[in-house]
Swiss-Prot record:
Record's subcellular location: Cytoplasm, Cytoskeleton, Microtubule organizing center, Centrosome; Cytoplasm, Cytoskeleton, Spindle
Keyword field contains Cytoplasm: yes
Assigned protein family: Belongs to the MOZART1 family.
Top-rank lineage group of the source organism: Eukaryota
Originating species: Xenopus tropicalis (Western clawed frog)
PANTHER family, alphabetized: MITOTIC-SPINDLE ORGANIZING PROTEIN 1
Role this protein plays: Required for gamma-tubulin complex recruitment to the centrosome.
Protein's name according to its UniProt entry: Mitotic-spindle organizing protein 1
Length: 72
């Protein structure tokens, strides 16, 4: 059981480091989103393709927000 505890601690520490790097790079990713991205990459998703999808979703979201604010 101590081994599982140590493993969870290592995972938590790794995610904390990745979150700090993410913040330094100003990615705008929160812990949950970053965790999802890491899991997708671990499952073989191309990180560059994932990055492109995230950027496109952000652009679409901003466009939608802008159109909603002008329609109001």
């Amino acid at each position: 059981m101590a081994n599982a505890s140590g493993s969870m601690s290592a995972v938590r520490e790794t995610m904390d480091v990745l979150l700090e790097i993410s913040r330094l790079l100003n990615t705008g990713l929160d812990m949950e989103t970053l965790s999802i991205c890491v899991r997708l990459c671990e499952q073989g998703i191309n990180p560059e393709a994932l990055s492109s999808v995230i950027k496109e979703l952000r652009r679409a979201s901003e466009t939608l927000k802008a159109s909603e604010s002008t329609a109001s």
